């Protein structure tokens, strides 16, 4: 029986490399997968998943009006698994579509993304995945400043912490830092 999985972690926790690894493992066995990602993430072009270690792969871009259930239903061949990158950027209706893919089409869905933003608030997609997922798993990494587990994302601008602003600002290592709670509130930026 298929399930909806939500695997979340902070920046630099290896979420995208995990997607690429899972896809590779399925495909090595001759089992087709569908990789999807939010069209909001434009760092490496719309419709691509790419890891910080340099691996990159084309994916179906999810726009605000994308009908995920309809898209999967209309594929010529039923996939063995659906893999979603940047799931935090999904809209409520996308997450409900993913649940229907699992329940109605019996296709497992693995969604990967951030749980909370730089203000330590849930993203829309994360909120609904936490509500609907059959299994929730944290992908762990460590704080950039100490050896504690990173649970938060610190946004920086020219080396200074930022706690206010638009929720979504696309950026990478130059903008976002994985940190523990202590260093979220008292970042060690200059050390």
UniProtKB/Swiss-Prot annotation:
InterPro entries: P-loop_NTPase, Thymidine_kinase, Thymidine_kinase_CS. One of its GO terms (biological process) is thymidine metabolic process. The keyword Nucleus does not apply. Pfam families: TK. ATP binds at residues 9-16, 85-88. Its EC number is 2.7.1.21. Disulfide bonds: none annotated. The active site is at 86 (proton acceptor). Keywords: ATP-binding, Cytoplasm, DNA synthesis, Kinase, Metal-binding, Nucleotide-binding, Transferase, Zinc. It catalyses: thymidine + ATP = dTMP + ADP + H(+). Zn(2+) binds at residues 143, 146, 180, 183. One of its GO terms (cellular component) is cytosol. The keyword Nucleotide-binding applies. GO terms for molecular function: ATP binding; thymidine kinase activity; zinc ion binding. Its main location: cytoplasm. It is found in: Cytoplasm. Homotetramer. Belongs to the thymidine kinase family. This is Thymidine kinase. The gene is tdk.
């Amino acid at each position: 029986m298929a399930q909806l999985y939500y695997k979340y972690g902070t920046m630099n926790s290896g979420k995208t490399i995990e997607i690429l690894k899972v896809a590779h493992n399925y495909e090595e066995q001759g089992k087709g997968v569908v990789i999807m990602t939010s069209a909001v993430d434009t760092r490496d072009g719309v419709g691509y998943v790419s890891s910080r270690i340099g691996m990159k792969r084309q994916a179906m871009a999810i726009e605000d009006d994308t009908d995920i259930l309809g898209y999967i239903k209309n594929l010529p061949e039923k996939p063995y698994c659906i893999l979603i990158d940047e799931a935090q950027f999904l809209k409520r209706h996308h997450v409900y579509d993913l649940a229907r893919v699992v329940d109605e089409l019996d296709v497992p869905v693995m969604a990967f993304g951030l749980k909370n933003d730089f203000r330590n608030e849930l993203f829309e997609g994360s909120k609904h995945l936490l509500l609907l997922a059959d299994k929730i798993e944290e992908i762990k990494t460590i704080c950039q400043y100490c050896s504690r587990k990173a649970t938060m994302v610190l946004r920086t601008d020219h080396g200074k912490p930022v706690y206010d602003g638009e929720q979504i600002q696309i950026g990478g290592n130059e903008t976002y830092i994985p940190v523990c709670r202590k260093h979220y509130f008292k970042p060690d930026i200059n050390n």
